[in-house]
Amino acid sequence: MSWLWGSTTNPQFEELAEKACSPLNLPYPQSEDIATALEVADMIRSKAIQPKMAMQSLKKRIASKNGRVQMYAIGLTDTCIKNGGDHFLLEVASKEFVDELSNLIKATTTSPEVKQMLIKYFQQWALAFKSKSELSFFVEVYNELRASGITFPPPPAPVPSHLLTTTTAPAWVDSDACMRCRSAFTFTNRKHHCRNCGLVFDQACSSHSMPLPKYGITEEVRVCDGCWAKAGRNKADAPAPAVPGRTPRSRADLDADLQRAIELSLAESQHSQNRHHSHFTPSEPPLAHGTVEDEDEQMRLAIEASLRDMEARPSAPAGLGEAPEPEYRPLPTFDLSPRENETILTFSNTMDQMAAYGERDLRRFPHAHVLAEQANTVGGRLRRNVEEKSTKQQMLMEMQDKLSQAVNLYGQILDGQQAYAAKRAHEEQARRYQQQQSYYTQQYQPQPQLYGQYPPNGYQAFVPPQQAYQPPQPQPEAQAQHAPSLYPTMPYTTPNFTSPPQERVYPQQSHSSPYSQWSPAPSHVQPGLARQASVVVPPVSSPVPAGVQRQASMTYGAPIPVAEQSQRQQQQYASAPPFASGAAPVDIPSAPPPVNLSTHPNSPQRHSYIPSHPQTQTQTQYESQPQEIPSQQDMQYGASAPPPDSLGSYVSEGTVGSAKSGLEQEHAASQIQPQPQPQASAQTQTQSQSQLQAQPQQNQYAAQTQLPAGMYNAASFPQPLPPTIFPDAPVEAPKGLEKEEKEEALLIEL
């Protein structure tokens, strides 16, 4: 109680300050003790030491020669400024303390670490003191230091205003009489100050004492009766109920509790035996026997009673409906009772009536002052009730917001799942569609054919897949007359086309050539021109060397016997591989010779429907009927082929006579081949005119004199072909073909 008499020294404060700023501590802030610093601040706030003495003690340690002590002293001063109270701030802002700090900042002998730390905290304190006018001296010194060139760090964030707000005990008020009972102070009736409110009372009105933690006072001090009543200390005099696990209990208390439990158990057992005497047999042996002589008889009886109670209970758990509901203590509430509500309503109605009458005289309402006192008494509880309801409303609103957010998040999750499922379905559908497209593309993609699969003559006949070979149908004679034939008539022996040929079934392939789908239908091909499509030979203006000849061209020094020619043809037919499309090729002696595709890889292949004739008929036609072609045949050949002088000279003896008719048939087949150009209609008209002009000339071949068998002349053989007989044939016909055909037709007529 030394602080009550205003003592200048406090050993406890000095001890704590020395402990917090000891030179034996580790470098700052490794050994900073926050608990000790707060105890020092509480002593200053509770006025256990005078603020001036506390300031001087801290100043002495800040001015120490030890840099470590200085740094810990500056940290302790900062803690005391924030928790010491306004009375300590006045001493900190005094000229004595501020000058000491400014001198340390300006001194050159100060340690750099101490100087930097002092500048930092000096700036923080100055910025915090700007809001208080009584601390303006500290701010003025701070501005002077900045103006003098002292470098301060950048200003920190605005310091909160409540940082320096500290609850401290109020200042004492002096008076000549007690402020409660109004009794004058005398020599015997001394005055006392309440440490809670600062007012002055006599002994009768301030006889209570209690600690004041809110002011940093941990020991009991004098308070008045009013502060005592407000704190509710009179209700706290009764002993508080013991809380299990928190209140220390002695062995005697435990023994007393055990004895009490035994007595209650015995009483309950005796009561149950009296009520249910018929359920127990007196000859029942005890469940527990005393084996120790000093065993307490009451303990044994209590244990037996407890065991019997456990056996009497059913082993099965009780149903949910039979389980006793736990009793919950009602929550504290500030709701008004019905009587209090009635009191407030009555007072409110009374005041409304007085306002309606406009009278200020309370004599007509004698109970108004009583109602006012009762309403005033209930007012505090009503305010707390309103605050409680407002708090609950705020909590419910926050819970509602959280529920709304949860619902929104759940909806977003569901939307995301649906969108993801739709996206997956769309991707799966697109993937299946691509698989189907790739499957169809692979299934209908034309398979490439190797060069070795083509027939030796370089042509391939089209036969619809999965169809057997069928003999050619006999053509009417009238139709044969109208169709101009490119072959001369045989006067000696005419092959019988109407006789049934030898039927053959050729192996079929599962696929067809990709060009076969563009071939013309068989019904549109004239019977006389039904032959494999050949290549259109462009006119060659330069002479061909005599040494360069086709493989199939043969020069005869003497007539070749028919048997040898037939044997060569049979060997050629036997060595020819089958067609790629499944139908056997028809090798005609007058047809172009086979082409080596290795030397002509780019030659386009054209296919047409060819009514194939049996091989035996073809052999009999050309083996037994050598013919002589009159001179008019050369004119017809000149109408459809280049002139003889542009193709070279004849061989001395001649070549195979059937080669000329083969070239004519190739030229006719190239005219029948469909062209994708818009000039197809004009070409068709030109072809029909040339065929009508060539028909009377063909009829004259039968009337001319034929040479005997085995005799040939120069006119019976065609001109030698150029070496490039099978170049890359163009798909389109030459543009000047129609004009040349018309001129040739006019020359023939002349």
UniProtKB/Swiss-Prot annotation:
GO terms for cellular component: early endosome; endosome membrane. Residues 447-484, 507-520, 565-585, 668-706 have a biased composition (Low complexity). Belongs to the VPS27 family. Component of the ESCRT-0 complex composed of HSE1 and VPS27. GO terms for molecular function: phosphatidylinositol binding; ubiquitin binding; zinc ion binding. Residues 491-501, 596-606, 613-635 have a biased composition (Polar residues). It is found in: Endosome membrane. It is a peripheral membrane protein. Pfam families: FYVE, UIM, VHS. GO terms for biological process: endocytic recycling; intracellular protein transport; receptor internalization; vacuolar transport. Component of the ESCRT-0 complex which is the sorting receptor for ubiquitinated cargo proteins at the multivesicular body (MVB) and recruits ESCRT-I to the MVB outer membrane. Its main location: membrane. This is Vacuolar protein sorting-associated protein 27. Residues 253-272, 294-313 form the UIM domain.
